[in-house]
Amino acid sequence: MKKLVCLIFMFLSLFQVSAHDFLRAVKDEIPGGYNFWVYTPVDYFYSQEQTPVIIFLHGASLCGRNLDRVRRYGPLDAIVKGRDIDALTIVPQNPGGAWSPKKIMDVLDWVKANYPCDTTRVYVLGMSLGGYGTMDVCGTYPDKIAAGMALCGGTSLKDVSGLGKLPFWIIHGTADRAVPIKQSKVVVDKLVDSGNDSRLIYDWWQGANHGTPARVFYMKKTYEWLFSHCLLDKDRPVNRDISISMSDTRRAYSDVNRNVPAPELIDGPSVIKEEGNEY
Protein backbone atom coordinates (compact mmCIF):
# COMPACT_ATOMS: atom_id res chain seq x y z
CA MET A 1 0.00 0.00 0.00
CA LYS A 2 2.86 2.42 0.77
CA LYS A 3 4.19 1.79 -2.72
CA LEU A 4 0.74 2.53 -4.15
CA VAL A 5 0.54 5.83 -2.25
CA CYS A 6 4.01 6.81 -3.48
CA LEU A 7 3.16 5.89 -7.07
CA ILE A 8 -0.01 7.98 -6.98
CA PHE A 9 1.96 10.91 -5.56
CA MET A 10 4.59 10.58 -8.30
CA PHE A 11 1.87 10.45 -10.94
CA LEU A 12 0.24 13.60 -9.62
CA SER A 13 3.58 15.39 -9.42
CA LEU A 14 4.91 14.37 -12.82
CA PHE A 15 1.76 14.98 -14.81
CA GLN A 16 0.40 17.86 -12.71
CA VAL A 17 -3.11 16.43 -12.75
CA SER A 18 -5.93 18.23 -10.98
CA ALA A 19 -6.29 17.48 -7.29
CA HIS A 20 -9.07 15.05 -6.48
CA ASP A 21 -10.42 13.25 -3.46
CA PHE A 22 -10.70 9.48 -3.35
CA LEU A 23 -12.78 6.89 -1.51
CA ARG A 24 -11.24 3.44 -1.20
CA ALA A 25 -12.75 0.23 0.17
CA VAL A 26 -10.27 -1.79 2.23
CA LYS A 27 -11.36 -5.39 2.67
CA ASP A 28 -9.76 -8.43 4.31
CA GLU A 29 -6.51 -6.58 5.05
CA ILE A 30 -6.66 -7.20 8.80
CA PRO A 31 -7.10 -10.88 9.77
CA GLY A 32 -10.19 -11.13 11.96
CA GLY A 33 -10.59 -7.36 11.83
CA TYR A 34 -12.96 -4.80 10.36
CA ASN A 35 -13.36 -3.87 6.71
CA PHE A 36 -13.42 -0.11 6.20
CA TRP A 37 -13.47 2.89 3.89
CA VAL A 38 -10.57 5.32 3.57
CA TYR A 39 -11.39 8.79 2.27
CA THR A 40 -8.40 10.87 1.13
CA PRO A 41 -9.22 14.59 0.79
CA VAL A 42 -8.33 16.94 -2.01
CA ASP A 43 -4.60 17.78 -1.98
CA TYR A 44 -3.83 14.92 0.43
CA PHE A 45 -0.88 13.79 -1.66
CA TYR A 46 0.71 17.22 -1.26
CA SER A 47 0.32 17.51 2.53
CA GLN A 48 0.30 13.98 3.84
CA GLU A 49 2.04 14.34 7.21
CA GLN A 50 -0.14 17.35 8.07
CA THR A 51 -3.42 15.52 7.42
CA PRO A 52 -5.47 14.55 10.50
CA VAL A 53 -7.46 11.32 10.85
CA ILE A 54 -11.16 10.93 11.66
CA ILE A 55 -12.62 7.55 12.61
CA PHE A 56 -16.42 7.31 12.40
CA LEU A 57 -18.33 4.49 14.12
CA HIS A 58 -21.83 3.74 12.85
CA GLY A 59 -24.95 2.55 14.68
CA ALA A 60 -26.38 -0.97 14.96
CA SER A 61 -28.61 -0.76 11.87
CA LEU A 62 -25.56 -0.62 9.58
CA CYS A 63 -23.83 -3.67 11.06
CA GLY A 64 -23.18 -6.53 8.65
CA ARG A 65 -20.81 -7.39 5.83
CA ASN A 66 -22.03 -5.02 3.12
CA LEU A 67 -19.49 -2.22 3.40
CA ASP A 68 -21.53 0.06 1.15
CA ARG A 69 -24.19 0.44 3.84
CA VAL A 70 -21.95 2.46 6.16
CA ARG A 71 -21.98 5.35 3.67
CA ARG A 72 -25.64 6.04 4.32
CA TYR A 73 -25.05 8.67 7.02
CA GLY A 74 -22.15 10.27 8.81
CA PRO A 75 -18.99 12.00 7.54
CA LEU A 76 -18.79 10.10 4.22
CA ASP A 77 -22.36 11.06 3.37
CA ALA A 78 -21.61 14.63 4.48
CA ILE A 79 -18.66 14.74 2.06
CA VAL A 80 -20.85 13.50 -0.80
CA LYS A 81 -23.40 16.20 0.06
CA GLY A 82 -20.68 18.87 -0.19
CA ARG A 83 -19.19 19.23 3.28
CA ASP A 84 -15.43 19.84 3.06
CA ILE A 85 -13.68 17.58 5.58
CA ASP A 86 -9.93 17.96 5.24
CA ALA A 87 -8.94 14.70 6.93
CA LEU A 88 -8.29 11.06 6.21
CA THR A 89 -11.74 9.78 7.08
CA ILE A 90 -11.90 6.15 8.16
CA VAL A 91 -15.23 4.35 8.38
CA PRO A 92 -15.08 0.72 9.51
CA GLN A 93 -18.02 -1.67 9.46
CA ASN A 94 -18.94 -3.66 12.53
CA PRO A 95 -20.27 -7.10 11.48
CA GLY A 96 -22.35 -7.32 14.67
CA GLY A 97 -22.22 -6.92 18.43
CA ALA A 98 -20.34 -4.29 20.39
CA TRP A 99 -17.52 -2.32 18.82
CA SER A 100 -14.08 -3.65 19.76
CA PRO A 101 -11.61 -0.92 20.81
CA LYS A 102 -8.73 -3.25 19.96
CA LYS A 103 -10.03 -3.87 16.43
CA ILE A 104 -10.56 -0.16 15.88
CA MET A 105 -6.96 0.48 16.91
CA ASP A 106 -5.90 -2.27 14.50
CA VAL A 107 -7.62 -0.28 11.73
CA LEU A 108 -5.86 2.90 12.86
CA ASP A 109 -2.50 1.11 12.93
CA TRP A 110 -3.09 -0.15 9.38
CA VAL A 111 -3.96 3.36 8.21
CA LYS A 112 -0.86 4.82 9.87
CA ALA A 113 1.32 2.18 8.21
CA ASN A 114 -0.12 2.78 4.75
CA TYR A 115 -1.15 6.45 4.67
CA PRO A 116 1.21 9.16 5.97
CA CYS A 117 -0.79 11.34 8.36
CA ASP A 118 -0.63 13.50 11.48
CA THR A 119 -0.72 10.91 14.26
CA THR A 120 -1.09 13.64 16.90
CA ARG A 121 -4.50 14.55 15.49
CA VAL A 122 -6.64 11.42 15.46
CA TYR A 123 -10.33 11.85 16.30
CA VAL A 124 -13.16 9.40 16.96
CA LEU A 125 -16.86 10.14 16.72
CA GLY A 126 -19.92 7.95 16.52
CA MET A 127 -23.64 7.61 17.11
CA SER A 128 -25.87 5.12 18.91
CA LEU A 129 -23.91 1.84 18.97
CA GLY A 130 -21.12 3.96 17.52
CA GLY A 131 -21.51 6.33 20.46
CA TYR A 132 -20.83 3.39 22.75
CA GLY A 133 -17.85 2.46 20.61
CA THR A 134 -16.54 6.01 20.72
CA MET A 135 -16.64 6.13 24.51
CA ASP A 136 -15.07 2.68 24.76
CA VAL A 137 -12.24 3.53 22.35
CA CYS A 138 -11.49 6.95 23.81
CA GLY A 139 -11.75 5.69 27.37
CA THR A 140 -9.38 2.81 26.60
CA TYR A 141 -6.84 4.71 24.46
CA PRO A 142 -6.99 8.37 25.58
CA ASP A 143 -3.28 8.79 24.86
CA LYS A 144 -3.80 7.99 21.18
CA ILE A 145 -6.96 10.01 20.47
CA ALA A 146 -6.81 13.83 20.37
CA ALA A 147 -10.57 14.30 20.94
CA GLY A 148 -13.82 12.37 20.76
CA MET A 149 -17.52 13.01 20.28
CA ALA A 150 -20.27 10.54 21.20
CA LEU A 151 -23.89 11.05 20.15
CA CYS A 152 -26.76 9.23 21.90
CA GLY A 153 -24.53 6.47 23.19
CA GLY A 154 -23.14 5.08 26.43
CA THR A 155 -20.27 2.84 27.42
CA SER A 156 -19.51 -0.72 28.45
CA LEU A 157 -16.50 0.45 30.48
CA LYS A 158 -16.79 0.07 34.24
CA ASP A 159 -13.93 2.53 34.72
CA VAL A 160 -14.63 5.70 32.73
CA SER A 161 -11.68 7.68 34.09
CA GLY A 162 -9.93 7.48 30.71
CA LEU A 163 -12.65 9.70 29.22
CA GLY A 164 -11.47 12.48 31.52
CA LYS A 165 -8.00 12.45 30.00
CA LEU A 166 -8.95 13.87 26.60
CA PRO A 167 -11.33 16.52 25.25
CA PHE A 168 -14.67 14.72 24.97
CA TRP A 169 -18.14 15.86 23.93
CA ILE A 170 -21.36 13.97 24.69
CA ILE A 171 -24.70 14.88 23.08
CA HIS A 172 -27.97 13.08 23.84
CA GLY A 173 -31.65 13.85 23.28
CA THR A 174 -34.07 13.77 26.20
CA ALA A 175 -36.74 12.06 24.06
CA ASP A 176 -34.45 9.28 22.81
CA ARG A 177 -36.35 5.99 23.09
CA ALA A 178 -33.77 3.81 21.34
CA VAL A 179 -30.92 4.63 23.73
CA PRO A 180 -32.26 6.34 26.87
CA ILE A 181 -30.40 9.47 27.90
CA LYS A 182 -29.51 7.84 31.22
CA GLN A 183 -26.85 5.84 29.35
CA SER A 184 -24.93 9.07 28.73
CA LYS A 185 -25.84 10.66 32.05
CA VAL A 186 -24.31 7.84 34.07
CA VAL A 187 -20.98 8.50 32.34
CA VAL A 188 -21.19 12.24 32.97
CA ASP A 189 -22.16 11.69 36.61
CA LYS A 190 -19.16 9.42 37.20
CA LEU A 191 -16.76 11.95 35.69
CA VAL A 192 -18.30 14.89 37.55
CA ASP A 193 -18.47 13.07 40.90
CA SER A 194 -14.81 12.08 40.60
CA GLY A 195 -13.74 15.62 39.67
CA ASN A 196 -12.53 14.30 36.32
CA ASP A 197 -14.69 16.46 34.08
CA SER A 198 -12.39 19.40 33.22
CA ARG A 199 -12.14 18.23 29.59
CA LEU A 200 -15.78 17.18 29.27
CA ILE A 201 -18.58 18.90 27.37
CA TYR A 202 -22.10 17.51 27.51
CA ASP A 203 -25.39 18.70 26.07
CA TRP A 204 -28.87 17.33 26.74
CA TRP A 205 -31.11 18.35 23.84
CA GLN A 206 -34.64 18.89 25.09
CA GLY A 207 -37.20 16.96 23.04
CA ALA A 208 -34.64 15.49 20.64
CA ASN A 209 -35.23 11.91 19.53
CA HIS A 210 -32.66 9.28 18.59
CA GLY A 211 -32.13 10.52 15.05
CA THR A 212 -31.89 14.26 15.71
CA PRO A 213 -28.16 14.39 16.60
CA ALA A 214 -27.21 12.74 13.27
CA ARG A 215 -27.11 16.19 11.67
CA VAL A 216 -24.06 17.00 13.77
CA PHE A 217 -21.98 15.00 11.28
CA TYR A 218 -22.93 17.47 8.52
CA MET A 219 -21.97 20.63 10.39
CA LYS A 220 -18.78 22.61 9.86
CA LYS A 221 -18.47 23.39 13.57
CA THR A 222 -18.19 19.69 14.40
CA TYR A 223 -14.93 19.36 12.51
CA GLU A 224 -13.62 22.75 13.61
CA TRP A 225 -14.01 21.60 17.21
CA LEU A 226 -12.32 18.25 16.62
CA PHE A 227 -9.42 19.75 14.64
CA SER A 228 -8.74 22.33 17.36
CA HIS A 229 -7.31 19.59 19.61
CA CYS A 230 -3.92 17.92 19.39
CA LEU A 231 -1.93 15.41 21.43
CA LEU A 232 0.96 17.89 21.45
CA ASP A 233 -1.04 20.23 23.71
CA LYS A 234 0.61 19.43 27.04
CA ASP A 235 -2.46 19.90 29.26
CA ARG A 236 -4.92 18.71 26.59
CA PRO A 237 -7.40 21.55 27.19
CA VAL A 238 -10.91 21.30 25.77
CA ASN A 239 -12.15 23.96 23.35
CA ARG A 240 -15.28 25.51 24.88
CA ASP A 241 -15.47 28.36 22.37
CA ILE A 242 -17.48 26.24 19.92
CA SER A 243 -21.02 25.22 20.75
CA ILE A 244 -23.61 23.16 18.88
CA SER A 245 -27.27 23.47 19.82
CA MET A 246 -30.26 21.56 18.55
CA SER A 247 -31.42 24.68 16.71
CA ASP A 248 -28.05 24.79 14.92
CA THR A 249 -28.81 21.41 13.34
CA ARG A 250 -31.66 22.95 11.36
CA ARG A 251 -29.00 24.81 9.38
CA ALA A 252 -26.65 21.82 9.07
CA TYR A 253 -26.71 21.90 5.26
CA SER A 254 -26.90 25.66 4.79
CA ASP A 255 -23.23 26.18 3.94
CA VAL A 256 -22.34 22.99 2.09
CA ASN A 257 -21.08 23.30 -1.47
CA ARG A 258 -23.46 21.09 -3.41
CA ASN A 259 -21.59 21.75 -6.66
CA VAL A 260 -18.52 19.79 -5.54
CA PRO A 261 -18.24 16.44 -7.37
CA ALA A 262 -18.43 13.28 -5.28
CA PRO A 263 -15.15 11.56 -4.38
CA GLU A 264 -13.69 9.28 -7.03
CA LEU A 265 -14.65 5.79 -5.96
CA ILE A 266 -11.95 3.14 -6.13
CA ASP A 267 -14.19 0.24 -5.08
CA GLY A 268 -17.96 0.18 -4.60
CA PRO A 269 -21.14 1.76 -6.04
CA SER A 270 -21.22 5.50 -6.63
CA VAL A 271 -24.78 5.87 -5.29
CA ILE A 272 -26.23 4.39 -2.13
CA LYS A 273 -29.96 3.66 -2.22
CA GLU A 274 -31.90 5.73 0.29
CA GLU A 275 -33.87 3.60 2.77
CA GLY A 276 -34.82 6.15 5.41
CA ASN A 277 -33.07 7.24 8.57
CA GLU A 278 -31.77 4.27 10.53
CA TYR A 279 -29.14 4.62 13.23
Specify the residue positions occupied by each region the protein language model found.
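Short beta-strand/loop motif that positions the catalytic acidic residue
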Residues: 164, 169-172, 176
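Acidic catalytic loop of the alpha/beta-hydrolase fold
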Residues: 175-180, 211
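Gly/Ser-rich "nucleophile elbow"/oxyanion-hole loop immediately N-terminal to the catalytic nucleophile
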Residues: 42-49, 98-128
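Active-site machinery of serine-nucleophile hydrolases
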Residues: 51-53, 57-105
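Primarily recognizes the serine-hydrolase "nucleophile elbow" in alpha/beta-hydrolase
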Residues: 111-114, 120-164
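Catalytic histidine neighborhood in serine/cysteine hydrolases
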Residues: 191-211
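A domain-start/cap signature at the N-terminus of enzymes
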Residues: 16-53, 87, 132, 137-140, ...
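Short alpha-helix in the alpha/beta-hydrolase fold that links the catalytic acid
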Residues: 68-70, 180-190
